[in-house]
Amino acid sequence: MDEKDLATQPQETGQDPRLPGQDAHPRGAQGAEAQAAEGPLAAHAQGAPLKSLKGDSAFRRLRQGRTGRGRYVTVRWLPAPELRVGIVVSKKVGKTVVRNRVKRRLREILRRLHLPRAHLLLVATPEAREAGFAELFQDLTRALKKSGLVQ
């Protein structure tokens, strides 16, 4: 019997191989999400999406805010009634696919952190394209501490 024929052979239990077994979670992928939601990051694992910082005036106001710099990210923030985030990744970082990857990683890191209410601006440096998720996480956390937003 060839390996390619193995997938088409019915299982010996008499159950259709395309149907989940009795031990499978009845709601599919939500079981995996529920497991990921356990632990110290549980509040943000299934939290609402981040609100975007919009408008040129909001970005200009942040120039007067507190600043923290890291190797991959510069952080600027001002206290505000709600958390809003602006992420800037210039074309110096790379082509669109690379810039979007950096933005997605930064957004996910922010979702995992417990941040106070503030208007927050993240500016990625060109070196951010080479950084992995863990490196970005450490660098952003360090920059947020330097800026005084988190302890």
Swiss-Prot record:
Gene for this chain: rnpA
Signal peptide region: none
Identification of the protein by name: Ribonuclease P protein component
UniProt KW keywords: Endonuclease, Hydrolase, Nuclease, RNA-binding, tRNA processing
Any one Gene Ontology BP term: tRNA 5'-leader removal
Record-linked InterPro entries: Ribosomal_Su5_D2-typ_SF (IPR020568), Ribsml_uS5_D2-typ_fold_subgr (IPR014721), RNase_P (IPR000100)
Subunit structure of this chain's protein: Consists of a catalytic RNA component (M1 or rnpB) and a protein subunit.
Reactions catalysed, as given in the entry: Endonucleolytic cleavage of RNA, removing 5'-extranucleotides from tRNA precursor
